[in-house]
């Protein structure tokens, strides 16, 4: 597995934060690093496999990667990221208690992926721009200024994330997308889902297409196929059982959609034939 080292990304041996844009981020094999990372998705879509679990990411997704997490990107489509790298909580000169603003693992569950709305994403871009222009000076005021900007970023993300709740349409869409991550295998009636999240059906269609480039049903099918591919690789369930577990009522239809999406059949994935190009 590839290991990324802080010496290759941080401007100096003492700098606690670095900005690393990926415009765009191509598919990248599984890796981990000796630093922490906040991944901010500007736009586009892709699959983020985080500690073995696949997540569909798009504009407004924010992922918190710890120094022991492993992850990779695949199936990317114009996926543009900004990575805010930071060494460790004790690398800061003026900041303490950062863990109170970061997602925390509880009972084995780590809420690594948050979502923010588009207006917050614009504020994030502005803050990151200030961080990039803050310079590399190591005198106390310069260091304090950079650390303050990093703290402002954490506060903005914390207050604005899905976890804090919001009422605007794009925030409701973010909540809907998170709901689909957990309920993808269920029969989905889009009219009922739109009503559940206080969106008109037209708004749901328009905003999901703007966020992901996909219609609602196309997005749901892709989500189901991604989950199915994960099970094909990491479980002993039959292809038919996996199809049903992931919301497909017909295994033949599932196989057709699967091949169309990934250019491999479910059996190919089960036998590891795609591993050569992973």
Swiss-Prot record:
HAMAP family: HTH_type_RhaS (MF_01534). GO terms for biological process: positive regulation of DNA-templated transcription; rhamnose metabolic process. SUPFAM superfamilies: Homeodomain-like, Regulatory protein AraC. It comes from Salmonella choleraesuis (strain SC-B67). InterPro entries: AraC-bd (IPR003313), AraC_XylS_family_regulators (IPR050204), Homeodomain-like_sf (IPR009057), HTH-like (IPR037923), HTH_AraC (IPR018060), HTH_AraC-typ_CS (IPR018062), RhaR_RhaS-like_N (IPR047220), RmlC-like_jellyroll (IPR014710). GO terms for cellular component: cytoplasm. Residues 191-212, 239-262 bind DNA. The record marks 241, 250 as: Interaction with sigma-70. This is HTH-type transcriptional activator RhaS. It comes from the Bacteria.
